[in-house]
Amino acid sequence: MNYAELLQAARGQMGPCRACPVCNGRACGGNIPGPGAKGSGTVAIRNFDAWRNVRLNMDTIHENFTPDTSLQLFGRTFKYPFFAGPVGAMTLHYGDKYNDMDYNAILVPACAAAGIAAFTGDGTNPKVMEGATAAIAANGGFGIPTVKPWDNATVAKKMAMARESGCFALAMDIDAAGLPFLQNLTPPAGSKTVEQLQEIAREAGVPFILKGIMTAKGAEKAVQAGVAGIVVSNHGGRVLDDCPATEEVLPEIVEVVAGRAKVFVDGGIRTGGDVFKALALGADAVLVARPYVTAVYGGGAEGVACLTEKLGAELADTMRLCGAAALKDISRDMVRV
């Protein structure tokens, strides 16, 4: 299966998603339920466009080499510096082909087999986290359960379930505070204080990653809370209209974190060249979400392998043509903003 065949197979299988040749947010706009962004739908488009505006500085005067795309992270070795991002409420947003449990049962082992890992989603149905953690446990802990910012008791319960899976890291998408189903809950859910996050990070038992950081101030608070990593993310434009693109804020966040935590970024990253750009701007790794949904719906495990190898080959090609033999060699002067 090649990528064009994957897209063709996915069309008509994903509810309102059209499995576009380029997943740039324009066709789905503000379609929620569905894969679109909130309100005007322009934040997802801005995410994509921002990476297009970063250009690559080609330099082929160097020794011949085979690029080393491997990433060392939290005691694990990955084939590539990118991960499948967390996606949930599959039936609501993508039709009835897969529910969350079925989706994760395909995604988690397929990512592990491809040499990367999947962040898994969470939901109001307890079976979502149960299914995700079961899939991670069955694959040697090769996955990152992502817990929503529920009330403290619910967070503690779900994190305990996540730890039992043997996961190598655990995440919370704090930006999910903007999702309607988390608002007006009793007990309160959504935003967390630094003190609450400190407690969650202490109780995690494994490296704790906080997803949904969009300002230098927010990054500093996350570091003060003791997180092992942050994800620069605006939730794919699905929680706050008119916010900036992740690429636009990444450099200032990297600067303030200053190596005290790992920095991931997502939002509109669609090619291996985009992965390279993110690393050149200071990210340690990236998350890719919507395209992995298309991969699962279009080809199951084979689709996940197809997309992963496509992104990996593009990354290696970019490294070769910009003079970076390994990820550590990717530097700011290799891109033009």
Locate each region found by the language model:
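Conserved active-site-proximal phosphate/metal-binding subdomains
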Residues: 1-26, 237-262, 270-337
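An N-cap/entry alpha-helix motif that binds or orients negatively charged groups
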Residues: 2-79, 330
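Conserved active-site and cofactor/substrate-binding residues in soluble primary-metabolism enzymes
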Residues: 38-46, 102, 106, 153, ...
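N-terminal functional module of multi-domain proteins
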Residues: 43-129
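Generic secondary-structure signature for well-ordered alpha-helical cores
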Residues: 49-57, 112, 116, 164-167, ...
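Flexible, glycine/proline-enriched loop segments at strand-loop-helix junctions
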Residues: 94, 119-121, 143-150, 182-188
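Alpha/beta enzyme core
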Residues: 108-109, 137-138, 150-265, 272-296, ...
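Long, hydrophobic, well-ordered secondary-structure blocks that form the structural core
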Residues: 117, 127-153
